[in-house]
Amino acid sequence: MFNPYYSLAQNFYFISPTIYKSRLYKKLIQLTKDNVFERNVEPELLWLKDILPQKAVFLDVGAGIGNYVYYLDYILFPENIYAFEPNKKLYKKLKKLFPKINFEPLALSDKTETSTLSFPIIDTEELFEKATLKEISPENEYTKIYSQKTQSIRLDDWINSKEISRLDFIKIDIVGQELNLLNGANETINHYKPTLMVKIEQEFHQENIWEVISKIIKLGYTAHYLHREKFGLEPLTPEILTQQNTIFAKDDSRYIKNIIFIKN
């Protein structure tokens, strides 16, 4: 049954973007080391504030609802932020909320082609954070699977089509497609030598995720994680990941998902 109030709430960002942003990103306002975990926010956001110069060029691959875009909009020049979000609904919303930031309705992969983006739905909740170019097998917990056609492009091809003189940082959150992206980004990595922050979660990989991390290390990187008390980088080892208990996978104070790769 059509619910006009639900429809109005979903499209409120068109009526008043400023008010909508203040509500959507409320937990990011006045974010500190003292409240970041109780607000269930990725602590790497605070770290980025400390290490990125204002002129840094930042790629947000898998922008989602825009947490990183919102936070970095106050730190970097907005014209130096490039955000990729292939989900049509999220892309449309982000373009309206952040008119000065560069958004691309593209998926980054190892091929330039038309692809299918899928994400599960439970009842009426769309699980955008699980959107993937991989085929999703229907599970009992999912009400249905939503799919849409999207354009995939190699990062090398995209970079070659732009006039970008520097590239400092690439944040990657693309649900198991990390290596596909990097396989299409060899020229970019070798030329710009950007720092990478890659969200790698075991539930989206058949192989042990250290195998994924090792392949990225072979591109000339060292792997690190953000220490939860020191808020500085520490070397990442297989033992650290092995000691993690998946029961805490949604607790950013106890579980490491964002792996930070520094170019050698």
Locate predicted features.
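Phosphate/nucleotide-binding beta-alpha loop and adjacent structural elements of enzyme active sites
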Residues: 1-264
